[in-house]
C-alpha cells in the first residue's frame, strides 16, 4: 500500500499520523525541524507547544472546547492521551508539562511501526500521491510561496504573540499567593494552581503607562496583517483603553489576597505552572511584541515580580492560513487538487486543540480514502463537526478569519431560552446532543 505523506509534525500532523497508522495505513512524516529552525520552536520534537502550555477549559459540560477534548478522547486521539498523561494543576483548565508532552508524542510515533520519519524541508507541494499539509502557523517561506501559487491566494495572515516564562524561585511569595480563580478544582493542588500578583490602582496605572511607552517590535514594510483576538498582545489591548486589561487577563474577580483578605486588589496578574517540576511559570494572557529589554523593565513593575528571572521572553510571529471556505471541501481536500489535504492552523482554526482535531479528522479521512472508503465529517452538532462546517463553508469567504471552537458555531436548539440567562440550560443540552451524535459517528466508522 502506498503511504500517506504528512508535511509538518506539529499537533495536527502528529495526530494525523497516529490516526492513519492506527487504521493500518503506512505514513511518512516530514518535519523540517531541527534542520530548518523557526523563530518560536526550540526543539525538533513532535507537537512542540510554543505559545502556551494550556489546552484551555476541560469542562465537557459547559464549554465547547471541553466538549472537543471529550470528542478527541472518544476518538482515541494521541494528543489528548499524552496531554492527560502529562497534565499539570490548572484549576478547570487542561495544562501540560510542554517538554514532557512533546517528548511523549514523539516517542509514541517513533514506536509505531507504520510511521516513518523523513527529516528535511518540503519546499514545493507535490503533484501526486496522498498528502496532508499540516505546516502550522510557521509555514516556511518556500512552501508558503508554493501554496499561494497553487491557490491563487494573496498572503493571508495574522500575527500571534507569545507570553513570557518566569523562574518560580524568583517570584516573591511574600507578596503573591496561590489560588485558582473562584477556587476551581477538585483537589487542593488544583485550587491553588495559579500564582497571583496583586496590584493597587497606583500600581496598575503605572504599569499601563510603562506598557504604552515601551519600545515595540516594528513590522516589516508591507506586513499589514491583523491580530487574532484570542491572542492579542497586552500592549495592543492597553491601546484600546486603559481599563481593557483590568477586564481581561488582569481582572481581579474570584480571588482573595491570602496576605490581606480584607483588601481587594484593583488588578491581578496570574502565572500558571509551565512544567511538572513547578520551576517555571508563564504569565497568563501576557502575549507581547515589546522588545526584550522593555519586557524586563515593564514586567518587573508587577508586584512580586520585581526580581523576576525570565526563562523565555515574549515575542511575535506571523501566522499564515488559507481562505478555507473558498478552497477546501468538507473532507479537508483542496478543491483544485484533491490529492492534497490540509489540517491544523493553516486551515483557519485557532488553538492547539482545534488544530489537533483537524489533524485527527484529516488523518481518518485520508486513511479511509486509502482503504477505498469515504468518511464524512462528524455532524455539525458536535464541536469537531461545527469547526469543519465553519471553515469549509459556514464562514463568509470574503471576511474569513481564524476561529476557536465555540457554541456560536453549533446549530441552535429548538425551544431553548436564549441570552446569558439561558446558558445554564442551553450549554449542557448542546454537549449532551454533541456526545450522542459524536458517538454515533464513531460507531458508524467501523
Curated annotation (Swiss-Prot):
Enzyme Commission number(s): 2.1.1.74
GO cellular component: cytosol
Cysteine pairs bridged by disulfides in the record: none
Alphabetical list of HAMAP family matching this protein: TrmFO
Membrane spanning stretches: none
Signal peptide (UniProt feature, chain positions): none
Reactions mediated catalytically: uridine(54) in tRNA + (6R)-5,10-methylene-5,6,7,8-tetrahydrofolate + NADH + H(+) = 5-methyluridine(54) in tRNA + (6S)-5,6,7,8-tetrahydrofolate + NAD(+); uridine(54) in tRNA + (6R)-5,10-methylene-5,6,7,8-tetrahydrofolate + NADPH + H(+) = 5-methyluridine(54) in tRNA + (6S)-5,6,7,8-tetrahydrofolate + NADP(+)
PROSITE patterns per the UniProt record, alphabetical: GIDA_2
PANTHER family listed in its UniProt record: GLUCOSE INHIBITED DIVISION PROTEIN A (PTHR11806), METHYLENETETRAHYDROFOLATE--TRNA-(URACIL-5-)-METHYLTRANSFERASE TRMFO (PTHR11806:SF2)
Gene: trmFO
Record keywords, A-Z: Cytoplasm, FAD, Flavoprotein, Methyltransferase, NAD, NADP, Transferase, tRNA processing
Family per similarity comment: Belongs to the MnmG family. TrmFO subfamily.
Cellular localisation: Cytoplasm
Species name: Paracoccus denitrificans (strain Pd 1222)
Cofactors, names only: FAD
Binding site for FAD: 8-13
Gene3D superfamilies in UniProt: FAD/NAD(P)-binding domain (3.50.50.60)
GO molecular function: flavin adenine dinucleotide binding; tRNA (uracil(54)-C5)-methyltransferase activity, 5,10-methylenetetrahydrofolate-dependent
Protein name: Methylenetetrahydrofolate--tRNA-(uracil-5-)-methyltransferase TrmFO
BP terms from Gene Ontology: tRNA methylation; tRNA wobble uridine modification
Superkingdom of the organism of origin: Bacteria
Biological role: Catalyzes the folate-dependent formation of 5-methyl-uridine at position 54 (M-5-U54) in all tRNAs.
Amino acid at each position: 500500500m502506498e503511504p500517506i505523506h504528512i508535511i509538518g509534525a506539529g499537533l495536527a500532523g502528529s495526530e494525523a499520523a497516529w490516526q492513519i497508522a492506527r487504521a493500518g495505513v503506512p505514513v511518512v512524516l516530514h518535519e523540517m525541524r531541527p534542520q530548518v529552525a523557526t523563530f518560536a520552536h526550540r526543539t525538533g520534537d513532535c507537537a512542540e507547544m510554543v505559545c502556551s502550555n494550556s489546552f484551555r477549559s476541560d469542562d465537557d459540560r459547559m464549554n465547547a472546547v471541553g466538549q472537543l477534548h471529550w470528542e478527541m478522547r472518544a476518538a482515541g486521539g494521541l494528543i489528548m492521551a499524552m496531554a492527560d498523561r502529562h497534565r499539570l494543576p490548572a484549576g478547570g483548565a487542561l495544562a501540560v508539562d510542554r517538554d514532557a508532552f512533546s517528548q511523549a508524542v514523539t516517542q509514541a510515533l517513533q514506536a509505531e511501526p507504520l510511521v516513518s520519519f523523513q527529516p528535511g524541508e518540503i519546499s514545493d507541494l507535490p503533484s501526486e500521491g496522498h498528502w496532508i499539509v499540516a505546516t502550522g502557523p510557521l509555514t516556511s517561506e518556500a512552501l508558503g510561496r508554493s501554496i499561494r501559487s497553487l491557490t491563487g491566494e494573496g498572503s493571508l495572515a495574522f500575527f500571534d504573540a507569545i507570553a513570557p516564562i518566569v523562574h518560580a524561585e524568583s517570584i516573591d511569595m511574600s507578596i503573591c499567593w496561590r489560588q485558582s480563580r473562584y477556587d476551581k478544582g477538585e483537589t487542593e493542588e488544583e485550587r491553588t494552581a495559579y500564582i497571583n500578583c496583586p496590584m493597587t490602582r497606583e500600581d496598575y496605572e503605572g504599569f499601563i503607562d510603562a506598557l504604552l511607552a515601551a519600545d515595540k517590535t516594528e513590522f516589516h514594510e508591507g506586513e499589514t496583517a491583523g491580530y487574532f483576538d484570542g491572542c492579542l498582545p497586552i500592549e495592543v489591548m492597553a491601546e484600546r483603553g486603559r481599563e481593557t486589561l483590568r477586564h481581561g487577563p488582569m481582572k481581579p474577580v474570584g480571588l482573595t489576597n491570602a496576605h490581606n483578605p480584607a483588601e481587594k486588589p484593583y488588578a491581578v496578574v496570574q502565572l500558571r505552572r509551565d512544567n511538572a517540576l513547578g520551576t517555571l511559570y508563564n504569565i497568563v494572557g501576557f502575549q507581547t511584541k515589546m522588545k526584550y529589554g522593555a519586557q524586563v523593565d515593564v514586567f518587573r513593575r508587577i508586584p512580586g515580580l520585581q526580581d523576576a528571572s525570565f526563562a523565555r521572553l515574549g515575542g511575535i510571529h506571523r501566522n499564515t492560513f488559507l481562505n478555507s471556505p473558498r478552497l477546501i471541501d468538507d473532507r479537508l481536500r483542496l478543491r483544485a487538487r484533491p490529492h492534497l489535504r490540509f489540517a491544523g492552523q493553516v486551515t483557519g482554526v485557532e488553538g492547539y486543540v482545534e488544530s489537533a482535531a483537524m489533524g485527527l479528522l484529516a488523518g481518518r479521512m485520508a486513511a479511509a480514502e486509502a482503504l477505498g472508503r469515504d468518511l464524512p465529517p462528524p455532524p455539525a452538532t458536535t464541536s469537531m463537526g461545527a469547526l469543519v462546517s465553519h471553515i469549509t463553508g459556514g464562514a463568509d469567504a470574503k471576511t474569513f478569519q481564524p476561529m476557536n471552537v465555540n457554541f456560536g458555531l453549533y446549530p441552535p436548539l429548538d425551544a431553548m431560552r436564549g441570552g446569558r440567562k439561558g446558558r445554564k440550560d442551553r450549554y449542557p443540552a448542546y454537549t449532551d446532543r454533541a456526545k450522542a451524535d459524536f458517538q454515533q459517528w464513531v460507531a458508524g466508522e467501523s
